C-alpha cells in the first residue's frame, strides 16, 4: 500500500519557486493548486533539495525559510542543511 507524503504552503511568489523545485526533484509528485494555498503530494517520499530551490529562486536559500510559508505536512520528517524529506516507512 502506498501512502502519499505531502506538504502545503501559502500561495505566493517564493512558494511558486519551491513547488517548481519539488516537482523537478520528485517525478511522481502532483500539485493541487487552490486559491490561497498549494499542496504537493508524492507517493511514499517527498524531498526538497536546497540546491534546486536556490536554482529556481536565483539566490541562496536556507531550508528553515520553508517554515514561513508552511501550512501543514504529512509524513516522517528528516531534515539536514541540504534536504527536507517527508516519507512513509513501513
Enumerate the language-model features and the residues they cover.
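Conserved N-terminal glycine/acidic-rich loop preference
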Residues: 1-21, 25, 36-56
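Short, conserved, surface-exposed binding loops centered on an aromatic residue
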Residues: 21, 30-31
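A common structural junction motif
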Residues: 26-29, 61
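Helix-rich interaction surfaces within compact, conserved domain-sized segments
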Residues: 34-37, 41-90
Amino acid at each position: 500500500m502506498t501512502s502519499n507524503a505531502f506538504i502545503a504552503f501559502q500561495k505566493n511568489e517564493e512558494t511558486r519557486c519551491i513547488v517548481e523545485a519539488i516537482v523537478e526533484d520528485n517525478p511522481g509528485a502532483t500539485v493541487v493548486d487552490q486559491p490561497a494555498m498549494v499542496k504537493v503530494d508524492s507517493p511514499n517520499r517527498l524531498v526538497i533539495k536546497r540546491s534546486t530551490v536556490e536554482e529556481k529562486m536565483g539566490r541562496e536559500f536556507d531550508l528553515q525559510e520553508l517554515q514561513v510559508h508552511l501550512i501543514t505536512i504529512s509524513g516522517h520528517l528528516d531534515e539536514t542543511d541540504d534536504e527536507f524529506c517527508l516519507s512513509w516507512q513501513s
